[in-house]
Amino acid sequence: PAQIAAAPAHPRIHYRVAAAEQSGLMDASLDAVVVAAAIHWLKVPHFNLEVQRVLRPGGLLAWVGYDPLQGAPPALQTWLDQLYHQRLNRWWPPERAHVDQRYSDLPFPGSSEPIPSQLRIELQWSMDQLLGFISTWSALRRADQAPALMTALRNELEALWPEGETDLHFHLPLMG
C-alpha cells in the first residue's frame, strides 16, 4: 500500500492492491501481466489460474527476476558472493531456492522464451546504496541480529571499497 500511495498518477493507469492469486480483475481484461522479482513469493499454481482468467487471448505473461549482483572489483565481488551464497544461507527463506533455480522449477503456464542473457540492470552505486540494497534481502530481514550484522557488513565493506572511489559500477543479470 505505501508503494502504491507513492506511485505517480497517470490518467491511463489504475493502481490497486490485491492478492496476485485473486486479483478481482475482469475476465480477459489484460494485455500483459508482468511479475518483477516476485514470482517466488506467490502461490504459483493459483496465480497461473488467475493469469489465465484475466489475460486476453494472445496476451503476454512475463516473469522477470535477476541473478546476484555482479561486476564489482574482484575482492568486493568475492565478498558479495560469499555473503549471498554462504554467510546468509541459514536465513534465506525456502522460496529463495526458486531464484537460485532461475525460476526453472516453477510451472510456467504455456510456451516460454528465456530472457536474453545480455539483458541486465546497470547500476552506479555508492557504498550506502549498496548497503541499502543488501538490507532489502529477505535473509537480512530474517537474521536474528540484523542491526549488528549490518554494522559488521558496513565495516567490512569500508575496508574493501576501493580508495578514492565514491561510486562503483555493478550489474544485475536479468533472468526469467
Description of each model-found segment:
Residues 1-26, 46:
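Class I SAM-dependent methyltransferase SAM/SAH-binding core
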Residues 41-54:
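A short, conserved alpha-helix within the catalytic core of class I
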Residues 52, 56-123:
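Conserved catalytic/acceptor-binding region of the Class I
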Residues 101-176:
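Conserved Class I S-adenosyl-L-methionine
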Residues 33-34:
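Hydrophobic beta-strand segment of the Class I
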